[in-house]
């Protein structure tokens, strides 16, 4: 059975259902008053991966959502977003290095 024939997962349903609510909540948060993913999940009855997927989708749509170890917030300036962007770019480089390692696993140079 092709993967495309499976119904939406509960994770995807949670993302679709709660994205607007999460956005409204984050718009009320500043860098000085962040909310954790755990708090968002508890308030909405969803798991951490769904919270992260919602934040990811909102960022893809252009919403300036910053994050740190303290939680998430709606950024008010590019300066507030800079550390989040740097962190995401570091993750990209790390994942690319892992992918390169996997490519070499059966094709050593």
Describe the residue ranges of each PLM region:
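Minor-groove-contacting beta-hairpin "wing" of winged helix-turn-helix DNA-binding domains
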Residues: 68-76
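Long, low-complexity, charge-rich intrinsically disordered regions
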Residues: 2, 84-109
């Amino acid at each position: 059975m092709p993967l495309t024939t499976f119904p939406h997962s509960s994770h995807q349903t949670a993302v679709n259902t709660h994205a607007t609510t999460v956005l409204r909540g984050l718009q009320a948060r500043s860098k000085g008053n962040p909310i954790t993913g755990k708090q968002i999940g508890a308030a909405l009855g969803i798991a951490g991966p769904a919270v992260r997927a919602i934040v990811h989708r909102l960022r893809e749509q252009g919403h300036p959502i910053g994050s740190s170890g303290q939680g998430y917030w709606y950024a008010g300036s590019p300066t507030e977003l800079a550390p989040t962007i740097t962190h995401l770019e570091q993750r990209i480089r790390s994942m690319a290095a892992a992918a390169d390692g996997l490519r070499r696993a059966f094709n050593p140079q």
